[in-house]
Regions:
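Extracytoplasmic gate region of multi-pass secondary transporters
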Residues: 177-242, 298-302, 306, 333-341
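Single conserved hydrophobic/aromatic residue that forms the stacking wall/gate
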Residues: 1-13
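A membrane-interface helix-boundary motif in multi-pass transporters
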Residues: 99-118, 219, 258-261, 342-368
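Interfacial helix-cap and linker-helix signal at transmembrane-aqueous boundaries
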Residues: 93-105, 210-211, 243-244, 248, ...
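Glycine-rich segments within core transmembrane alpha-helices of 12-TM secondary carriers
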Residues: 73-99, 230-238, 326-337
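Helix-loop-helix hairpin linking two adjacent transmembrane segments in secondary transporters
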Residues: 84-139
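C-terminal transmembrane helical hairpin of 12-TM major facilitator-type secondary transporters
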Residues: 256-304
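Cytoplasmic helix-loop-helix junction between adjacent transmembrane helices
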Residues: 44-82
Length: 368
């Protein structure tokens, strides 16, 4: 998935939105073969990663095409929250679906559940291929909407030459290797590398944390309720994406400056995770709420850093930079999750003590 972030982004450079969507739909194919053995499951997960990794660069580029700069973080936060909605819906839809197919004698139930869920990707691909058009050629976009979308290119204070230069900038082609010559590319790279691990650590390790510290197995009602609440809290990121627009409307700052101010605010909230473990001695709800807030802040921050790409690069290059940032975030997340697992194993084996905590809880406190 880390590598195919770049593949998907390169397809977007060529404006092959439909072709890229077809690649993303390969995730649906993967779902249908991940049902026989562990090895098939691993192979299917690889194919799924190839398909899903290209979706995000395409989504960011489409956001840049359909929204002015001041609204892009908000729109990004909305579609970014879609994965959270899916995570909330999965536990209450997929198991009943599997049980239904099992009850009517279709294998063990899970096989058909994989096929049905994977088939949704092809439906989405069809809608995308037949309905999506750029705003300037989309008959469903009226003149007023198009004027709003293109407001960044229609500044009355700019001369015709300046507007022409801005349009040329948006259409400028920058090769993949040339992107690495710009310090802005490395700013996005480092920003994603250093921060994506926060989200993926909490996403991956919170069920284990609930089990290790509080003894609630992931299939118990209490554990599922805690995870549901955590995901629900992260939905606050939608409102976080609105903050730059509010700052722009109230202060008149340019989109880039407003985004920097909003990102500084969001960057402070994950520090609350330092209190998750100590407060967890009183109730397991405290760490869940704190982790949810930290996750929401990270998602808001991430929506803004992706929107910053549109402030610094031409539209034709946005998908490439987003793909590079996604790759960096994947590498950083891999390092943090792998390192965390090793630390937790070491803490459990040695009964390590740290700041009043012993064993795995000590390891969790160090990572938090």
């Amino acid at each position: 998935e880390i590598t195919t972030r770049l593949v998907g982004s390169e397809m977007c450079i060529r404006d092959s939105h439909n072709a890229e969507e077809m690649l993303s739909a390969t995730g649906a194919v993967a779902s249908t073969i991940a049902i026989t053995s562990v090895y098939y499951f691993i192979a299917a997960r690889i194919v799924l990663g190839v398909g899903e990794a290209g979706n995000f660069p395409a989504a960011i580029k489409v956001t840049a095409e359909y929204f002015p700069k001041k609204d892009r973080a908000y729109s990004t936060s909305i579609f970014n929250a879609g994965s959270t909605v899916g995570a909330l819906a999965a536990p209450i839809t997929i198991p009943p679906l599997a049980r239904y197919f099992q009850s009517i004698g279709v294998g063990n139930g899970w096989e058909m559940a994989f096929i049905v869920i994977g088939g949704l990707g092809f439906i989405w691909m069809g809608l995308w291929m037949f309905l999506y058009k750029k705003p300037n050629v989309n008959p469903r976009v009226n003149a007023a909407e198009l004027e709003y979308i293109e407001q960044d290119n229609n500044n009355p204070e700019e001369s015709a030459e300046q507007q022409a230069a801005a349009n040329d900038f948006d259409n400028k082609k920058i090769s993949f290797l040339q992107c690495f010559k710009f310090p802005q590319t490395w700013a996005v790279f480092v920003g994603k590398f250093m921060t994506d691990g926060v989200w993926w650590f909490f996403l991956f390790w919170t069920p284990a944390y609930i089990s290790d510290v509080y003894g609630f197995a992931s299939d118990t009602g209490t554990a599922q309720m805690l995870i549901f609440v955590l995901y629900a809290i992260t939905m606050l990121s939608i409102y976080g994406g609105k903050l730059p627009t509010i700052i722009i409307n109230k202060t008149g700052k340019n989109p880039y400056a407003a985004r920097m101010q909003a990102m500084l605010i969001f960057a402070l909230f994950p520090l609350l995770a330092l209190f998750a473990q100590p407060l967890g001695n009183y109730s397991y709800w405290y760490p869940i709420i704190i982790i949810g807030i930290a996750g929401a802040a990270h998602q808001s921050w991430s929506a803004n850093i992706y929107s910053v790409v549109g402030d610094m690069f031409p539209k034709s290059t946005i998908a490439t930079i987003v793909g590079i940032g996604g790759m960096a975030g994947g590498i950083g997340s891999f390092c943090i999750n792998m390192g965390s697992g090793r630390l937790f194993d070491y803490a459990a084996e040695t009964n390590m003590t740290f700041m009043g905590f012993e064993g795995k809880p000590a390891g969790y406190f160090i990572i938090f």
